[in-house]
């Protein structure tokens, strides 16, 4: 893989739709590990690296992207993985003021903590944590769809965050009621 197409995101990247422990099938497709990476618009260093990696993947994938007439469509005319949360998910507070990328892999990502220790406890890495992601970009041309996709390599949890999209914890839903006599 061309190193120009590999990026490690900044420390304020938030993980959402984290299907990192078990692969998930979408609409009958082959099961994949995946995560949505929410990157603050203020993280211009990471966003610049991603834009350069997308450009490098486009250049390297020109043969794959070529149309029947021999022409390569401009980058602006094909699908790219970097999307604007304010435009595409305006009602989702987690995506406000951020870009996002959906990264996928056929193989499980390595998952480590801030000290690079492997995380084995599934409850430690969930939708809502903050950390870094090692991702790569590549061109694709499948079933008439052309674009640049994002592959998921590894993940690093740096800090906890409010869980996203999951159900609440029972400890948060209930309080201890000592005065009630449920049997009497």
Where are these regions (language model features)?
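OB-fold ssDNA-binding interfaces and closely related basic DNA-contact patches used
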Residues: 1-100
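Detector for Asparagine
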Residues: 2-3, 12, 19, 27, ...
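Residues in well-ordered beta-strands of folded domains
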Residues: 36-38, 102-104, 156-158
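Structured, beta-strand-rich domain cores
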Residues: 63-144
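Compact mixed alphabeta submodule
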Residues: 112, 116-184
